[in-house]
Amino acid sequence: MLDVALRNLAFAYDRGFALRDVTLTFARSTHTALIGPPACGASTLLRLIAGALKPSAGDVILGQRRVNDVKASARPLLAVTAAIDVPGRWSVQHVLVAAVHTRTLDREDRHREYELAVDKWSLGPLLDRKMRTLSDTEAVRVQLARIELLRPAVLLADRLLERVSPSARTQLADAFYRTMRVSGTTVISAPCSTDELAYTDRVVVLHEGNVVQSGVAAEVFARPASDAAAIATGDVDVIPVVVRGNTVESVIGAWEVDPPPFQGSGVALVRPSDFTPPAPGEDSDFVFGVEEAGFAGGRWIAHGMLTGGVRLRVELPREANVHKGRLMALRYDPARFRLLPRELAPLQPTVPTDVVPPLGETR
């Protein structure tokens, strides 16, 4: 299998640079996810590696070979999306047979791999169906079987699972990425959800065409270098803060930090799961007013507005008594927060929750 290297890679559209000075190495037989906010440059980077776009500067290296001038069809890789690149009139069987026939196997081995793929991806009842008659999830299952049969050295997957039903996505992702790991394929993906980060060896965070952070997904989640890195790895609340000495002041209370990471204004990047209801007898850190609440994924998700128009999203255990309009006492561990310096405008008072006029002024 092959490793992939990018050296000072840049690409510009007419409106400006989409990627700037990207230098990365993707080790062979590993899975790296390119993540970031919308228009971060992940899909553009995959297209540059695939050969669908030509770099404005820098090099793409596959193994030991610089491939900038090598046609996309001649590069030893496979680039895929959720849309399978075969005629809609083809049957599922035709797609799979065409894939396995690209391999240098004898007839018996080809037939065995074909049968294993059909069974693994539950495609038996679909073999005679034409591709254009399949549901989105069925078509993606065919795509995954096809990729397994092609056995690419390098796989570039751009939102491969975005059309899969949410109820089937986790199961298919687990089966597919384990298959790629066993086969030794070097996978570079732009995932369609943060759930897919569970199957990666590393994530690379892109923002406005620049690499802003890379590392193991758990490390980036816990210590994001920016809002972009925090958002790319999970839900996040951005809470304005002011650091004075060793004290951090915010709309959810104040806490001590030693040593302080900066002085003056900034933000705290806070995960919704960092908040918990106090146990009986425990003090709370602040009171949260629930404006909207819903139940999903085995927990409550509540939204509310704090002083100065700061919106807060919290995740609460399923046994919590959560409903619209309820005031809830919450606790947090500030050691879990990520503090970043930032110039901020003063918070604007909100009415009527935060500013109550004197009684005489209301008459």
Locate predicted features.
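Helix-to-loop junction immediately C-terminal to a conserved catalytic motif
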Residues: 50
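ABC ATPase NBD coupling module
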Residues: 66-78, 102, 220
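Q-loop/switch helix immediately C-terminal to the Walker
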Residues: 89-102
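Conserved ABC ATPase "signature" region
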Residues: 109-126
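Conserved ABC ATPase "signature" C-loop
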Residues: 209-210
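ABC ATPase "signature
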Residues: 214-215, 223
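Glycine/charge-rich catalytic "coupling/switch" loops of P-loop NTPases
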Residues: 252-294, 320-363
